[in-house]
Swiss-Prot record:
Key words of the record: Cytoplasm, Pyridoxine biosynthesis, Transferase
Name recorded for this polypeptide: Pyridoxine 5'-phosphate synthase
Record-annotated active site: 48 (proton acceptor), 75 (proton acceptor), 196 (proton donor)
Gene this protein is translated from: pdxJ
Catalytically driven reaction(s): 3-amino-2-oxopropyl phosphate + 1-deoxy-D-xylulose 5-phosphate = pyridoxine 5'-phosphate + phosphate + 2 H2O + H(+)
Taxon lineage: Bacteria, Pseudomonadati, Pseudomonadota, Gammaproteobacteria, Pseudomonadales
Record pathway: Cofactor biosynthesis; pyridoxine 5'-phosphate biosynthesis; pyridoxine 5'-phosphate from D-erythrose 4-phosphate: step 5/5
Amino acid sequence: MTEATRILLGVNIDHVATLRQARGTRYPDPVKAALDAEEAGADGITVHLREDRRHIQERDVRVLKEVLQTRMNFEMGVTEEMLAFAEEIRPAHSCLVPERREELTTEGGLDVAGQEQRIRDAVRRLAAVGSEVSLFIDPDPRQIEASARVGAPAIELHTGRYADAEDPEEQARELQRVREGVALGRSLGLIVNAGHGLHYHNVEPVAAIDGINELNIGHAIVAHALFVGFRQAVAEMKALMLAAATKR
């Protein structure tokens, strides 16, 4: 595998915790899912500790920090509570995301351009404890350029509009936006990741984009795991991504 065809898979295990929290039980354990994902080829584990604690809990994050063999990508809102927690646990990677209590999942990208100083301060605090920071943003040139200005080393492009496109023409337009976003981010020296809404039937065109470093995928893998098991679900997704990346 050459550097050009290398692509990483970050497995988001939030929805394993969603199933647990639905009944207030101790199972299924997202930590076990994370370890299974690593054994199946995941390059990292993503968790989002939301303000309302609807799925992942602080204990999950603390245990994962101690047991992961790969790395944790800690998704977090830009709040003092989350910044203080991240400074305590020192995740290898952290991703700043927008967050609203009423949303089912993260609905759009972070408005970096509209709050540059606030984001710059958060990036500095996280970098000071050794965490590589990415910003979850729409594939919008204004937001990509702002991300570079605030000092973030990485961005994660929101692929939700591509994933939700209702016809082939719209999907093609949104895929082109992602392609252009990747190219711009790379030209500015940013590491470019992507994710949101990706599944087994739409991941390949995104994985084939030259310059994408990593895809973060969760819901589709957790859903597929109900039928084939967690390790198999992760392995199938990784295989699709690697096959697509060879076409770059």
